[in-house]
């Protein structure tokens, strides 16, 4: 759980990564209605356990996805320290299988299925 005293969510790389992933594909024709919540996202990152192994990307695909995210953040400019931290969180989410093939966060149902399997 995140302490709210002196906490500026707009400067939290985890929150910024969560927002980027949670809104990916919003408004397009996809079956995913909503992603996991921020607290659950943080829990999964902290546990560092693979959530859905079949979502793990090959190194080549992961690098391509991360390059796409980098271009979105920088628009071809320099990568700030904050951007770099956000990309590290996004990379970890990919490596833990928390992001599907459409680059969107898993839905609650997928997380619950994982939770019930352990």
UniProtKB/Swiss-Prot annotation:
<protein>
    <recommendedName>
        <fullName>SPbeta prophage-derived uncharacterized protein YolB</fullName>
    </recommendedName>
</protein>
């Amino acid at each position: 759980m995140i302490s709210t005293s002196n906490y500026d969510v707009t400067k939290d790389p985890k929150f910024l990564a969560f927002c980027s992933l949670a809104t990916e594909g919003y408004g397009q024709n996809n079956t995913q209605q909503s992603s996991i919540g921020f607290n659950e996202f943080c829990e999964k990152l902290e546990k560092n356990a693979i959530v859905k192994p079949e979502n793990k990307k090959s190194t080549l695909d992961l690098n391509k996805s991360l390059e796409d995210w980098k271009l979105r953040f920088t628009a071809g400019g320099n990568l700030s320290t904050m951007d770099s931290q956000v990309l590290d969180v996004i990379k970890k989410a990919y490596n833990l299988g928390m992001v599907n093939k459409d680059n969107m966060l898993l839905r609650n149902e997928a997380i619950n299925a994982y939770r019930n399997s352990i």
